[in-house]
């Protein structure tokens, strides 16, 4: 189905814009210049602003952000604060904030929630890593950029503005900056994404696209049809860094945005721009505007084009540009990291943490390439300093950012050290390191492809014996490797271990057809202390009972379901379906009938424990944030009656001292007897009042949220049952922590009487140990340490005795070898533990490289070992003569035969 759209807006008519078709790309565009024959965008036009500003003054990044917001503020738009670059803070379908419209998805764009203002304007830092391999090379690509967006959300009842006003505002913003109106072209285009579609304009000047104006007005069906949306959205995107670039006319966007930082990096790397020559750099950057690695795929071909234009050898051009491009990438990546880490992302092996680590390691590689003495921490600190005027909240996270960068750098060094063996193992069995190998090495071992290439080159030079003589291992690293990796991880939908089945925003549901049944009245919200209710049975399906009202909390939000009785029937599960109907599964329904009125009674002790543990979860989360830092974010939880657990993001193991401090703060909150209040409020109101921390437990759907507020401690959107005061939680005891995945720590804990029971159990263990050792409890550590040291000494003595026994046995057994075929064979019964038999066999085969040694002890343990020249595989031999297995040179197992029978079997196999 083709949609026709009239792109001739009021501004074009008033100003005299002409519609033309580009002679290069055939796209239609609008221009004031009657002589123009091309659309103005690259590659149809080269950059024509490099070397001279096209605005009335040069702007810094901070100035351009203010200029953009102020312009639209004066033109009837309400400025709103930026959202985090981690989109997971308020939505679960994407990892990073990729556009200004993303902050309003899905709730506002679907019409579920009204926007915080209408129309509005935002300067939103965005991150897109699908162009990461272009960064530094093209002069225009950035991993992190600021999308200026003015948005209007139009309904029939409240229509703000549409195409005419949008284009007018855009044109006026450009010309107010001093950009010549005759240089501006509006290219007709069509936008589709996320199931929506609409016409759009790409706004170009001097060869560079500075803005896109999208008019989101259609939903696209699975059949490819377009349906008018009830909510029509003006979705604009202005590349504010590109405006800064156009205002300065520098060869690349990087000098324009990061000028002072790039200067320091160039000085530190001893790169003298005067040696390169302004002409080479400017020409190179202009032609680089035509480069797009995604389309061409091979930097070498692109380099060749630039070299030909400049009359340079391509290798010479490489040597000139590569260090500079590395510097550009470092500047870009470090600002991106300032936002990612400043917004609380924790580097890890999954999701947005994986992307942060990718950026860290890529930057460290560039720093090494150009030989900087400045560290990654130093450069990110510079970025924070530059950003603090507009984004002071990032500077508040500086301590965490510096600490996590140091931790990541240390991990990277360890990874490189350990990685050589992994590469050698692949090289041993293959003639080529493939792209899949490179991705696997990067994902599982953290090895950048450049490091793998260095290791392979070293292997090839040495003609390593690990790689079958002197064969050459082939390896090709694609120019867009990091783009491929980033896209794979941005698209992954699988849940991590901490979230799978435990995401606290998820609700367990049950699938039963209950179309004729009304929503269940949930009494536990109005009064969580109500222990029973007289309710009517609306429906019985198998062992599932539906009541008109219930005191039983259905499983969800990480909290286990309540148990109790319906009549005299035990409840074994409580779930809620998507229509708000609570399904109680009982042991059997004998004696229960539809329309009966029954008493539904809670197991109150179980409910009270659940309430205590759930409130304790909020308390511990808040305490952990105080002790470990503001980056702490809940990734999952599981609340049961006897204990609970909480999964939080953190970049290193939690120490014993930190656990004690978290526990101390948590119990102080309990002692402070703080009221726990539950209120219902709109999504916008909750977000503006409390921020995105309300989604610690996961993304909650809908316009109305249930907010749980422990005043001054923790505020979250939560649907669970809770105590009404922290004093009711009782003693909180953290039992243990574990690292369930890189970047995620799990805390397990109890509350109330369960904590008392746990401490009592620990005390019993301590007293029992004290009794066994025969010393008071306070002397246990010292005594146990002494015993341990003595044990280690005894172990050494025993090992020495094993060696001596082995040597003695070797002397006794050396004369008992028999020649069987071409091998020296020894099959003997020897007293000793497996370790002793291993020592004896080692001594024997080390002296006879053509020998097979088979030893059997009284317990039926059998060991087979052979010398280097033996071609028979011991694992296969053992499986034929006994039970067990092993490898080529050693195998072990169990044998019930006497020694003579065993010897006969062995000889038969040889």
From Swiss-Prot:
Chain spans, region Disordered: 488-507
Source domain of life: Archaea
GO cellular component: cytoplasm
Key words, A-Z: Aminoacyl-tRNA synthetase, ATP-binding, Cytoplasm, Ligase, Metal-binding, Nucleotide-binding, Protein biosynthesis, RNA-binding, tRNA-binding, Zinc
Enzyme Commission code: 6.1.1.7
Positions with a binding annotation for Zn(2+): 614, 618, 718, 722
Keyword ATP-binding: yes
Claim: Nucleotide-binding is one of the keywords in the record: yes
Biological-process GO terms, alphabetical: alanyl-tRNA aminoacylation
Catalytic reaction list: tRNA(Ala) + L-alanine + ATP = L-alanyl-tRNA(Ala) + AMP + diphosphate
GO molecular function: alanine-tRNA ligase activity; aminoacyl-tRNA deacylase activity; ATP binding; tRNA binding; zinc ion binding
EC top class named in words: ligase
Comp. bias regions, Basic and acidic residues: 488-505
Cofactor list: Zn(2+)
Record remark: domains: Consists of three domains; the N-terminal catalytic domain, the editing domain and the C-terminal C-Ala domain. The editing domain removes incorrectly charged amino acids, while the C-Ala domain, along with tRNA(Ala), serves as a bridge to cooperatively bring together the editing and aminoacylation centers thus stimulating deacylation of misacylated tRNAs.
Family the UniProt entry places it in: Belongs to the class-II aminoacyl-tRNA synthetase family.
Name assigned to this protein: Alanine--tRNA ligase
Species: Methanococcus aeolicus (strain ATCC BAA-1280 / DSM 17508 / OCM 812 / Nankai-3)
